[in-house]
């Protein structure tokens, strides 16, 4: 049985909590720092939500992680994202209310796709797959599907467009696709660089210990 599916029911609660927090806390901080400003500005970073859920899927599957810890990670980030949105709505009013429309629940499958994209990448890496190529493929597929889900739901269900039709939707689809996929990719590149840096440092420490 692979490490991704081994039972961990006997694992001490303190270990489960530590396993959860070491993964959840950095991602939650990134979500808190960027989600309130969905498009970014000169003073605010662009929204990192898509990258956060992709990275969460990766890190909550990377290594031996209990299934309960994974579920808590996903639903904890969903709850945090919803809380940020509703607080933003309360503080800023009408503009944010456009996002809290009948299309809003479709963010759940959109983020779920990103989560499973990251989880697939973790499995590929642990199976010895080529990291860079697998990462690009995972993000390209998961990011595109997530965009289609969230964009289509917002266009057809939000009520923002009085007379929606296919031609206009396709035009808007292509207009925002590049930004949707590339902006989170910048966060993913930064995360990959940090991951490789810490992995290299850890290997160096282990080599020093084994040499002593």
Residue positions per predicted region:
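Short, charged juxtamembrane terminal tails flanking transmembrane helices
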Residues: 2-10, 203-212
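Residue-level signature of transmembrane alpha-helical entry/exit and packing/kink sites
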Residues: 19, 23-27, 73-74, 103, ...
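Aromatic-anchored segments of alpha-helical transmembrane domains
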Residues: 27-39, 78-92, 140-152
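Structural signal for the C-terminal ends of transmembrane alpha-helices
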Residues: 35-37, 56-69, 113-126, 193-202
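Alpha-helical membrane segments and adjacent membrane-interface helices in multi-pass membrane proteins
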Residues: 44-112
């Amino acid at each position: 049985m692979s490490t991704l599916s081994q039972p961990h029911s006997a694992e001490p609660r303190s270990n489960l909590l530590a396993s959860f927090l070491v993964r959840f806390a950095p991602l939650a901080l990134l979500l808190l720092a960027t989600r309130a400003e969905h498009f970014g500005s000169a003073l605010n970073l662009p929204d990192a939500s898509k990258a956060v859920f992709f990275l969460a899927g990766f890190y909550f599957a990377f290594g031996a992680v209990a299934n309960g810890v994974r579920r808590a990670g996903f639903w904890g980030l969903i709850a945090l994202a919803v809380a940020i949105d509703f607080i933003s709505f309360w503080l800023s009013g009408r503009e944010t209310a456009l996002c809290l429309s009948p299309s809003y629940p479709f963010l759940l499958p959109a983020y779920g796709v990103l989560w499973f994209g990251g989880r697939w990448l973790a499995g590929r890496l642990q199976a010895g797959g080529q990291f860079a190529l697998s990462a690009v493929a995972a993000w390209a597929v998961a990011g595109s599907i997530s965009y289609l889900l969230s964009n289509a739901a917002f266009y057809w269900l939000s009520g923002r467009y009085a007379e929606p039709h296919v031609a206009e939707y396709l035009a808007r689809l292509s207009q925002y696709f590049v930004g949707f996929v590339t902006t989170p990719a910048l966060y993913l590149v930064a995360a990959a660089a940090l991951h490789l840096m810490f992995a290299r440092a850890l290997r160096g420490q282990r080599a020093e210990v084994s040499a002593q």
